[in-house]
């Protein structure tokens, strides 16, 4: 069993949420990078989570959000767009904090759970965690 197959099993993702979201990003040339626990998987042993955290470029955020509305269930908060789908326990969290915008400039394509994805550099992954902790927005594990 591959890491990706294991993720699909753990998240009971029968809706292919992650694949559909990544296709939407790719097909619409929306720049993004992975942050959070899944990004850590690019630098260490795989971390399996029910959340995939992303950052999308600020100037494409409005268009991206309108594209999501036709395909996914969306919950918007001041700093986050939570994307879910029926038949999946997986959540994609698009962080909208403007401090994260520069992360894409330093992101590199890396192997994450058997997928080649743009991943924030390790310093930015840590920086995002520190900011979320300081702001009180970090999810409790």
Question: Where are the model-predicted features located?
Answer:
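Compositionally biased terminal segments of proteins
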Residues: 1-141
